[in-house]
Amino acid sequence: MRRILLSMIVLIFLASPILAKNIVYVAQIKGQITSYTYDQFDRYITIAEQDNAEAIIIELDTPGGRADAMMNIVQRIQQSKIPVIIYVYPPGASAASAGTYIALGSHLIAMAPGTSIGACRPILGYSQNGSIIEAPPKITNYFIAYIKSLAQESGRNATIAEEFITKDLSLTPEEALKYGVIEVVARDINELLKKSNGMKTKIPVNGRYVTLNFTNVEVRYLAPSFKDKLISYITDPNVAYLLLTLGIWALIIGFLTPGWHVPETVGAIMIILAIIGFGYFGYNSAGILLIIVAMLFFIAEALTPTFGLFTVAGLITFIIGGILLFGGGEEYLVRKEVFSQLRILIITVGAILAAFFAFGMAAVIRAHKKKARTGKEEMIGLIGTVVEELNPEGMIKVRGELWKARSKFNGKIEKGEKVRVVDMDGLTLIVVRERKEGGEK
């Protein structure tokens, strides 16, 4: 009996390595490559390292992003103690520009059918006339040397890697596999694990070669947090620009309709989110400054109508500010289409604002013509709201228009109180506090 028990114990110990599962982590990176993307890579790789995983697979879909963030990510991948597999997924995804460098810096590259890789020419953003600023030869040559070294280190086709920059070359999965740029074409994670099982890859941090063992594997997914999703969304330059624009207009609406507070609150939140997005993606502070100046022009037009002078100045400043927003000299590794789409958005928003103010100015002109015909008789008796304390002079809003006003009895009338127009002195309304019983103390 004792021999039987001992035999069973020995069999259990011998079987335990066979029963043990190889852990593979899967994480998703989607959107612009920013400094926050590096934080995601670092967090995901660290989790996999701590669990002594067989590998970590990063599902990548990106149009590119900042060069400095990309290089930090590549460095983190090459310092990893376990294999990092870049999987361009799902179908329709791309590892463009900065994404290509990240893929070439990984230990194994896989692509799903219908994806693409390549087009890595560095650009510097937008010029004042709206054209894309190409990187000077010195910077371009640096990135050519960098991408070739990444390809050579991993035994991939350095000539094609160079053409990703010099010819803005893009490849399908089948072409990339044929030219020795990637190792696997797979429809899903299961097919990727099956095809890459037994492949050898070099771990630069210790110089050793590792044979991937994806038999008896346990796949663990690292779901993106709410913060990951939010940052990924607002670092899209189109989204960040819209948030900034809508936020500014919400502040203007709140400024012109005091006492409600909702537009100011929503606008402030939008602007904060836009600033966070710009902070991760990179921006030109001159562009932000011009957009703020444009906002001041619009507010000035609303408070002291100049029949279009401040509006035109605001629109021109607003569009130039938007164009310069991404022309701060940072090296961007993104598809040119990203900046082209942004330019279209800036022009479209500018056109909408122009149309809005054209109709707005027409309404103001009609209102002023009407006032000129009717005189003060039409104003007397109207009820308004104090928007700037009368002590004895201030501002009130009557029929949705801002007017300079003066208390008839030189008393103080608080902001938010109702007043009645009793006379006019030039363009200044003479008012009294509106009370149920009438009169003013």
From Swiss-Prot:
Question: Keyword Transferase, does the record have it?
Answer: no
The residues annotated as the active site are: S97 (nucleophile), K138 (proton donor/acceptor)
Q: Kindly report the pH dependence of this protein's activity.
A: Optimum pH is 5-6.
Q: Which GO terms describe its molecular function?
A: serine-type peptidase activity
Q: Where does substrate bind?
A: G64, G65, R66, A67, A119, C120, R121, P122, I123, L124
Classification via InterPro entries: ClpP/crotonase-like_dom_sf, Membrane_assoc_protease, NA-bd_OB-fold, NfeD-like_C, NfeD1b_N, NfeD_membrane, PH1510-N
- TM ranges are 239-259, 271-291, 307-327, 344-364
Q: What is its EC number?
A: 3.4.21.-
**Protein's UniProt keywords contain Transmembrane helix:** yes
How this chain sits in the membrane, per its record, is: Multi-pass membrane protein
- Taken from the record, one Pfam family name reads NfeD
Q: Name one GO cellular component term.
A: membrane
Q: Which UniProt keywords apply?
A: Hydrolase, Membrane, Protease, Serine protease, Signal, Transmembrane, Transmembrane helix
| GO biological process, any | proteolysis
Q: How does activity depend on temperature?
A: Optimum temperature is above 90 degrees Celsius.
Activity control: Inhibited by divalent metal cations, including Mg(2+), Mn(2+), Ca(2+) and Zn(2+). Mildly inhibited by 0.01 % SDS and 0.1% dodecyl-beta-D-maltoside. Activity is nearly abolished by 1 % SDS.
What is the enzyme's main class? hydrolase
| Reported impact of S97A | Abolishes enzyme activity
What functional role does this protein have?
A: Protease that cleaves its substrates preferentially near hydrophobic or aromatic amino acid residues. Can degrade casein and the stomatin homolog PH1511 (in vitro).
How does this chain assemble? Homodimer.
PANTHER family given for it? INNER MEMBRANE PROTEIN YBBJ, NODULATION COMPETITIVENESS PROTEIN NFED
What family does the entry list? Belongs to the peptidase S14 family.
User: What's the name of the protein?
Assistant: Membrane-bound protease PH1510
